[in-house]
């Protein structure tokens, strides 16, 4: 399975650079809409140029430029593959994951599963996917409309596809992630994912850093305050690792 990705490297390269995999959210329409991964290369290049980070933004399976069809398990596996790729680059030292919305939950799950990940930042992240699990065929229809799944046929192994919706849970994964650091950022006015989910994730982790963005909605990629919190946290993470 071949996936497209944007890889940003610091000017002049170097070795043992901090690195992060950033996971986009579930698209709100064809091409991604407000959750489009096309909005992330600019952020990645900024982080590489201003902070000296290696940044990878994978276009998860089913997204434009990438092969395959959407499944929750598949997207998690794509993030694990991205981590594996980053770790193998000569420029890369320590690795973190970050994500927005669905991507935030899967960044937690992938980070928990790979002990080489130093910490995770989760923004506008659902604690679980029970709403999807309760109505998988509605999700499948949404995925088709967004261009993530072949229009003509259901995903191969629909039962397995459906099962992953209840099996994959950021709330469970943060237990495995601890005591590695967790940042949880959420908009106080998020109407897609209840702010209670953010409190649940940070509380279940036990030492998660929770930052609520006053008046912000769900699409935190487009909120400068949320991005400032993310970049500040990553910078502190890297500095604490050095000292």
Task: Put a short name on every predicted segment.
Residues 1-15:
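N-terminal cap/lid segment of alpha/beta-hydrolase-fold proteins
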Residues 110-160:
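Hydrolase active-site cap/lid region
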Residues 216-227:
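Catalytic histidine-centered segment of alpha/beta-hydrolase-like enzymes
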Residues 12-47:
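Short, surface-exposed "cap/lid" segments of acyl-processing enzymes
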Residues 191-197, 221-222:
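Conserved alpha/beta-hydrolase "acid-adjacent" motif
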Residues 39, 69-90:
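Alpha/beta-hydrolase active-site loop
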Residues 42-65:
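Conserved alpha/beta-hydrolase
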């Amino acid at each position: 399975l071949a996936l497209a990705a944007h890889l940003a490297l610091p000017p002049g390269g170097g070795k043992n650079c901090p690195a992060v995999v950033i996971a986009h959210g579930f698209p709100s329409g064809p091409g991604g809409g407000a959750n489009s991964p096309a909005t992330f290369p600019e952020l990645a290049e900024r982080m590489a140029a201003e902070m000296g980070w290696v940044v990878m933004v994978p276009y998860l399976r089913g997204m434009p430029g990438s092969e395959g069809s959407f499944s929750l398990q598949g997207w998690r596996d794509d993030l694990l593959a991205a981590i594996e790729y980053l770790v193998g680059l000569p420029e890369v030292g320590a690795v973190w994951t970050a994500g927005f919305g669905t991507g935030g939950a899967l960044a937690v799950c992938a980070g928990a599963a790979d002990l080489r990940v130093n910490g995770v930042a989760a923004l506008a992240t659902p604690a679980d996917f029970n709403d999807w699990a309760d109505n998988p065929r509605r999700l499948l229809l949404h995925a088709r409309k967004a261009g993530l799944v072949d229009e003509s046929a259901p995903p191969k192994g629909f039962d397995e596809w459906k099962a992953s919706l209840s099996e994959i849970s950021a709330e469970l994964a943060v237990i495995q992630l601890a005591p590695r650091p967790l940042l949880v950022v959420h908009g106080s006015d998020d109407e897609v994912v209840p702010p209670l989910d953010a409190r649940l994730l940070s509380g279940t982790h036990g030492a998660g850093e929770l930052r609520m963005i006053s008046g912000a909605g769900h699409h935190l990629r487009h909120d400068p305050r949320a991005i400032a919190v993310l970049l500040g946290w990553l910078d502190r993470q890297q500095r604490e690792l050095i000292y």
